[in-house]
């Protein structure tokens, strides 16, 4: 049977979207709700906030830094067995964490082992999804990533309820059971049968071309800065509210308010990304700027109504930037290099995920509150949005819409030419 030269823009791709939906929920929904466990770990181990912050920080960093491994394995063996293996590792890490007697045990179990499992699930799934869609890519990505918002809405109060009934050890056992569902999600993945382009080259040739691709490198710097501040509210907002004398349950509920807005933001952003003409980078820059501003305003808000309003604004804008961050990548490098490109991008931006939470915790320990933590986090996002201005076609307002072929080929400001790539699917 002849292979397609263009993505089907549907078909089994919608099953892949469903799989990605649950995977994003079980990976980032857990990470975003980990602020509920943060307070428990500080009390249980009698450690400073900066040291406890390393648990989630290591998990985020390993998930992103290990993404090239997941991408390379998916290129060789396909995404299905790789993602299923990742689900087993993620569940095993949470299981071992329930027996932890020190922070080092949590660093190794949640940070290293579960983080490795997440690295094998997220990037291969999104790369597989990108190969199924072209015209509807932003919408499909937005729908897939709504799992993050939906799970954040449900997981934060659910985890708080678990802690009140089973303590943190029993709660981690149940989180381990939830993580096993990643195995079922991986079983649904099936790459489309697209005609191969031998001119693209193997993994080494693709990696070399990307490392000399100016727009791609600038984009990774921008996302690294964004990633440094992006997760701070999900880790420290509950603790910040408790410093303002909020009870634990209402504080966890505010994370659910953020999650609902995040959910709406992802869907709206995915629709706008496909509907608005021009590069998706412009919309990404808009949402990133608004997210940075709302982050910096958190310490200013004191009244409950102001905090709820700010949580709604932050949730919507932070959710809106997420699907576009992945939709921009195929515009820059094409879909033929998406496995390698997405893995490399996740690895480089892991630097931000590694440094952001401990820096925020350190500022809390030094200053005695989270004011500096939120202001600095907002500054990182604003810096990243500034770098997005340098990407190709950002200021191009021609009435003639540039196709993805133009976006890829004209973006190459490198001395090492990229292999020619058939981009008819874009």
Curated annotation (Swiss-Prot):
Q: Looking at the UniProt record for this protein, which Gene Ontology cellular component terms does it annotate, in alphabetical order?
A: cytosol; Golgi apparatus; Golgi membrane; plasma membrane
Q: Name one Pfam family in it.
A: MFS_1
The job of this chain, per UniProt, is described as: Proton-linked monocarboxylate transporter. May catalyze the transport of monocarboxylates across the plasma membrane.
Q: State its location(s).
A: Golgi apparatus membrane; Cell membrane
Implicated disorder = Type 2 diabetes mellitus: A multifactorial disorder of glucose homeostasis caused by a lack of sensitivity to insulin. Affected individuals usually have an obese body habitus and manifestations of a metabolic syndrome characterized by diabetes, insulin resistance, hypertension and hypertriglyceridemia. The disease results in long-term complications that affect the eyes, kidneys, nerves, and blood vessels.
Which of UniProt's keywords are assigned here?
Cell membrane, Diabetes mellitus, Golgi apparatus, Membrane, Symport, Transmembrane, Transmembrane helix, Transport
Q: Which InterPro entries match?
A: MFS, MFS_dom, MFS_MCT_13, MFS_trans_sf, Proton-linked_MCT
Q: Where are the transmembrane segments?
A: 11-31, 52-72, 81-101, 106-126, 139-159, 169-189, 221-241, 252-272, 283-303, 306-326, 338-358, 374-394
Note whether Phosphoprotein occurs among the keywords. Answer: no
Its membrane topology: Multi-pass membrane protein
Q: What is this protein called?
A: Monocarboxylate transporter 13
Q: Name one GO molecular function term.
A: symporter activity
Disulfides per UniProt: none
Going by the entry's taxonomy, the superkingdom of the source organism is recorded as Eukaryota
Pull the Cytoplasmic topological domain ranges from the record: 1-10, 395-426
Task: Give the record's family classification.
Answer: Belongs to the major facilitator superfamily. Monocarboxylate porter (TC 2.A.1.13) family.
Q: Output the Gene3D superfamilies linked to this UniProt entry.
A: MFS general substrate transporter like domains
